[in-house]
Amino acid sequence: MTATPARRTSLASPATKPVAGGLALAFLATLAGGALLALALEAGGGGFDAAANFDTYLWRVARFTIWQAVASSLRSVLFAIPIARALYAEARFPGRGLILRLFALPLALPALVAVLGVTSIYGRNGLIAHISDMLGHPMQPDIYGIAGILIAHIFFNMPLAVRLLLAAYESIPDDYWKLAAQLGMGSRARFRLIEWPVIRRSLPGMIGLVFMLCVTSFTTVLTLGGGPRATTLEVAIYQSLHFDFDPARAVALTFTQLALTLLILLILRLTGRPSEEGFTQTATPRRYGSPRKTERLFNIIVITLGFLYVALPIAGVVVSGLTADLVRLLSERIVWHAIATSLALGFSAALLAVFLSLALVAAREATRNARIANIFDTGASLILVMPPIVIGAGWFILLRHFTDPFVMAPLMVVTVNAAMAMPFAVRLLRPAWDTAASRHNKLCSQLGIKGFNRLRLIDWPSIRRPCGMAFAFAMALSLGDLGTIALFGSDALVTLPYLLLQRMGSYRTFDAAGLALILGVLCLALMMIADRAAASRKEAFLQ
């Protein structure tokens, strides 16, 4: 009796799984390709002269986009180096694990919420202004413009750089620290001979990653830019469609943004991407010998300053939100409508992202052709080449020729947010799926267990927690998204971030603070669910 081929894994038959993966790739290709096609057609016809819009305004916006990203990324990494060095040296520092968990929050918070936290500290009515008044030296710091953009970008990206640098420090062999202690090396010698070579190898990819995040930072620049002099390409795209309705200019800006993004990704691919492999939140004392008192004092000061820089805006969100009239806010029908809309769109986007990611992961594992498997493996990540505002702009221009774009708003928000979450979902699902396949493929083949029965009985127990993690993470990303809804939002489709932006625009700051707290709590709750699921999965694996 001939055994069933080992290729028969889960979800469906071996022939169906690559088809499902192909459909997932087709979804991404349609989403990105449709936007590009619309932009190309708009540039080449319809009476629009897109080439004429490659003018001094566009190049000024492009220069500012690059300049603010360079300034933000260099400052973020420059500040991260001493903080990461101090955190690694003080492995037994009280609250070290708490600080590292705190450093994971900025990227988990919706950008709009974090921006309000930054303004609560550095704004004209912020904490620093109040302290200066109390000291008799009143000052009104101007948070809007390049200063505010830099402060916010450092808040987002410095903690990320610290975590990546700590991962690099973890790769230093124990023997290096032993030898340094035996030779009596001082702090400068250790940094120059042991630490700097490791940091230097990580810098190109790290700076490139932070630069990419700053170039595609839409919400931060939209809220803190303060005017035409501090406008990036993505904000200019939004303004050209939402306020001026100038499709030709939007096309020129979008192609410039796309070219810049592709260039950055090419540089990242050549320099290599930083990894958090080996990173831990627990104390890992690998250094030998006791640091000098002056060195330890310096480390404590640096850690404290880094902690305050990240903690104060987060505390500002909580304090400002609690001072708002939450009872009145929660009694407004529009607020509950926005919450329900956000949850419904977020749930739909997360479900779609997990389903399509599973299709890609299953197709990759079932495919024996290495080249095709690599396409399934990297296909989801390619969507990151196009920022959400670019995809939204392309489809907005395309849909207006056939229907009212705002009628299609829910579908566009769900599909774009699902696509943007897929690279992260694939990364969470792939290890568990591959492990389950390697363990069970042969036995299931011999027993003839396949299709839905295998998924239900064999594979689902192994991938249930990763699916929960991916779902919670994707839903949190969708809840805090402003890029797509900023273009397609209207009175008929109001999400929590869109309502928050409206309240900020009408200078209802207390309402905005309350909404920011609600949005932040929702997103952080989902992130905590994902984190708990990850921890439970790790414990189960160790057992």
UniProtKB/Swiss-Prot annotation:
The complex is composed of two ATP-binding proteins (ThiQ), two transmembrane proteins (ThiP) and a solute-binding protein (ThiB). Part of the ABC transporter complex ThiBPQ involved in thiamine import. Probably responsible for the translocation of the substrate across the membrane. The gene is thiP. InterPro entries: MetI-like, MetI-like_sf, ThiP_ABC_transpt. It comes from Brucella suis biovar 1 (strain 1330). The chain crosses the membrane at residues 19-39, 64-84, 102-122, 142-162, 205-225, 250-270, 300-320, 343-363, 379-399, 406-426, 468-488, 510-530. Residues 62-266, 339-530 form the ABC transmembrane type-1 domain. This is Thiamine transport system permease protein ThiP. It is found in: Cell inner membrane. One of its GO terms (biological process) is thiamine transport. GO terms for cellular component: plasma membrane. Belongs to the binding-protein-dependent transport system permease family. CysTW subfamily. One of its GO terms (molecular function) is transmembrane transporter activity. The keyword Nucleotidyltransferase does not apply. Keywords: Cell inner membrane, Cell membrane, Membrane, Repeat, Transmembrane, Transmembrane helix, Transport.
